[in-house]
Each structure stands twice: as structure tokens, then as C-alpha cells.
Design a protein with these regions (language model features):
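N-terminal accessory regions of S-adenosyl-L-methionine
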Residues: 2-169, 365
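Class I (Rossmann-like) S-adenosyl-L-methionine-dependent methyltransferase catalytic domain
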Residues: 4-36, 40, 155-167, 171, ...
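Conserved alpha-helix/loop element of class I SAM-dependent methyltransferases that forms part
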Residues: 173-192
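Conserved class I S-adenosyl-L-methionine
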Residues: 191-201
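Conserved SAM-binding loop of SAM-dependent methyltransferases across substrates and taxa
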Residues: 202-213
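A short acidic, Gly/Pro-enriched loop at the edge of an enzyme's catalytic core
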Residues: 274-283
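A short beta-strand submotif of the Rossmann-like class I SAM-dependent methyltransferase core
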Residues: 285-288
Length: 370
């Protein structure tokens, strides 16, 4: 039966819009999520969505329809950067190397803390990872910024956390600051004015960066429900900033004007086609492009060459994109060193390091020549 189901899924892969019709009127689907989702399904961006994210979105919306956003941190977040299972030893290489000569103490009450809606096994895995990441971050200059991150948002959606040195710690907090550490090593962020992040997810990185670099204007580009989650989060994080949901604008001039008049703006992927040449100082793609088909990656690279001056990318060194098989194609394999990402000739690689965790991921910086 499993073989038959797999074959059927290759011919007729799951599509999120069919599931959405069943849950659209659920009590926990609020008007903002309903608006964003319907706009997404009717947009060109829906056609860019990989089979993998059709499957994940069905899972994400099932959680949202049952619990709403209030339990995001213990449900949907598991499809982003909340690790409750460690599948490969090599994920730990960098973090262990960082800490092998730096002993630290673990509070057993925190290590064995049972997190809401997690099993004990999941909780212990998550809690121990918090310790490893916290003490890795402590060895960097970016550690000084940890107090700038707001518990109202990093802990405000039923997020799992432990307390270390009287500070509430989540993996999202630490990973976001470790992302900033790499970005700052690749580029002088203080010199930039406008940043765009594609695949911005929950908005965790955006919130961390804007909590440190308060002068920046920020564009978040993603699909539903990520835009809904990050929009809800960032309105809570930055109540004094002008935050604009621009997902239905199809006029180039109007879009640029509204982006310019916003501190934080939200767009769908296809709207990137309307951005002016060299209008973005830095584009970020953190933990997202390795989930795409090769043709979609090249679609984005072509757009980046037009509108951005610098590009930061974090990806798995090697991966097979889940659910990418179809009747005509085997696995969609992506291997950076083998050239599967086909970096444009006018991009100069200026930065390359391994991610602290998972350490079989690469962080890469590119200067885009005009």
C-alpha cells in the first residue's frame, strides 16, 4: 500500500489549496490569516511553491486551525528552527569543536524541564541544545546583544525555553544571533539602509537584526502562513514602527513608494520582479533555498542580480529536497560544491564558513557586480 501511495503522490503530488478549502472557516483561522492565505493561493507565488512546502503547509495549517497562533512555538515552529530530534552526528561538529576546551555547568532542573506539548525525550534534546548554543554564542562578540531580544515575542507563542544565568533562552534567540554574527562577518551591516529577507519564516532573524541595527528598513518575502506568523510577531515586537502588508500590490511604482514609506514591509516572492535595480543593499536567504527546485533557485538568482548589491546565503552543503520526485524526475539533489546552485558569473564570493549548528550547513556571502 505504501508503494502505491508513493507512486500516486509522484503523479499527483499533494496541493495545499485543496486542504485549505476544508479548514478556511475554522474558528482559529482569523481574518488576517484568511486574507493572506487566499491572496497567496491566487498569486503567481503559489506556482513557485515546492512540493515539499505544499506538504509542510498542510501540517502547519492543521496546527493553526486547531490551536491558532498562540501555540506556534510548540507546533508549527518544529518545521522551522525548533529542533526536538537530532538526526545526524555531523550536525554537532562545529559546536563541539567550539566548546571542547570550554567546560560549562548544566542545571539539572533546566536540562530535564518538560516543555509544554513536548515529550520528555523531545524536551531534553531541546534543552541540551539550548545549552550548547548558548555557550557557543557566549564566545562571540554578538553575545552582548542577547539582552536586546524581547521575551514577549521569543517566548510569547508557547515557545519552549530554559533559563541560563538568569536569562530565558530559546534556540530561536541564539540561532538568530548566530545568524547575525555570520552576516556581520561577511558584511558591514551598519553601512546598509535596506535589507530584504527571502524565506523569512517566523521573523526571528528580522527581529534580532532590527533589535541591534535599529536604522535599517526591512522587507520580508515569504509565502503563507509564514508571512502571517512574522507579521503578527513583528507588530508585537515593534509597535512604533510602520509595518505594511503589501501582498496585493501589482503596480511597480506603488510598491516601491509603499516600501519606502515603511519601516518593515511584507511581500510575496513574485513581487520581487517589481523592485528597482540595485534598490536593496543586502538580501538574506537563511535556511530556505535548499528546499527549492533548481529552476526556482535560478529564478531568484536572476532577480537578485537585478535588485540587490550583496547576498547572504545559508544552506545545507548537500541535500535531497523532500517530495521532489515526480513521474519524470528522480530526487532533486542539491550539492553546493558540485555546482548545483549555479552561482551567476557576476557574483563574487567574499565569505564562506560553516554554520555553528547544524554544522553541515554553509554560510556564504556574495558581492554582486553591476
Amino acid at each position: 500500500m505504501n508503494i502505491i501511495n508513493k507512486f500516486i503522490n509522484r503523479i499527483l503530488p499533494k496541493r495545499f489549496d485543496k486542504y485549505w478549502k476544508k479548514i478556511e472557516d475554522s474558528q482559529n483561522i482569523d481574518s488576517t490569516l484568511r486574507y493572506i492565505t487566499n491572496s497567496f493561493i491566487n498569486s503567481k507565488s503559489y506556482k513557485l511553491t515546492s512540493n515539499y512546502w505544499h506538504v509542510l503547509n498542510i501540517s502547519n495549517y492543521k496546527s493553526l486551525s486547531e490551536f491558532g497562533i498562540k501555540k506556534y512555538g510548540s507546533t508549527v515552529a518544529k518545521n522551522y528552527y525548533t529542533f526536538t530530534e537530532i538526526y545526524h552526528d555531523e550536525w554537532f561538529d562545529e559546536v563541539i569543536n567550539n566548546l571542547k576546551d570550554s567546560p560549562f555547568k548544566i542545571d539539572s532542573a533546566e536540562a530535564f524541564k518538560k516543555q509544554a506539548d513536548f515529550s520528555l525525550k523531545e524536551s531534553i534534546t531541546y534543552n541540551y541544545l539550548c545549552y550548547l548554543l548558548f555557550y557557543s554564542l557566549k564566545k562571540t562578540n554578538t553575545f552582548q546583544h542577547i539582552s536586546k531580544l524581547n521575551d514577549k515575542t521569543y517566548l510569547g507563542f508557547n515557545d519552549p525555553y530554559i533559563k541560563i544565568n538568569d536569562t530565558n533562552i530559546t534556540t530561536d534567540k541564539i540561532i538568530s544571533l548566530l545568524d547575525y554574527e555570520k552576516i556581520q562577518k561577511a558584511f558591514e551591516v551598519k553601512k546598509f539602509k535596506r535589507v530584504l529577507e527571502i524565506g523569512a519564516g517566523s521573523g526571528r532573524t528580522c527581529e534580532a537584526i532590527l533589535s541591534i541595527e535599529k536604522h535599517l528598513k526591512y522587507i520580508l518575502c515569504d509565502i503563507a502562513p509564514a508571512i502571517y506568523i512574522s507579521y503578527s510577531r513583528l507588530k508585537l515586537a515593534f509597535p512604533d514602527k510602520t509595518i505594511s502588508l503589501l501582498i496585493d500590490i501589482d503596480n511597480k511604482i506603488e510598491l516601491e513608494e509603499k516600501i519606502e514609506n515603511s519601516d518593515i514591509a511584507f511581500v510575496f516572492p513574485h513581487q520581487l520582479e517589481m523592485l528597482n535595480e540595485n534598490s536593496v543593499d543586502l538580501t538574506l536567504a537563511i535556511d530556505c533555498m535548499h528546499e527549492m527546485d533548481k529552476s526556482t533557485i535560478q529564478y531568484y538568482f536572476k532577480l537578485f542580480s537585478h535588485f540587490t548589491k550583496n547576498f547572504y546565503l545559508s544552506i545545507w552543503e548537500k541535500t535531497d529536497v523532500p517530495y521532489s520526485k515526480n513521474i519524470l524526475r528522480k530526487k532533486n539533489k542539491l550539492d553546493y560544491e558540485s555546482g548545483d546552485y549555479v552561482i551567476p558569473e557576476n557574483w563574487k564570493n567574499i565569505f564562506k564558513e560553516k554554520i555553528v549548528f547544524p554544522s553541515n550547513m554553509l554560510s556564504l556571502g556574495f558581492k554582486i557586480k553591476e
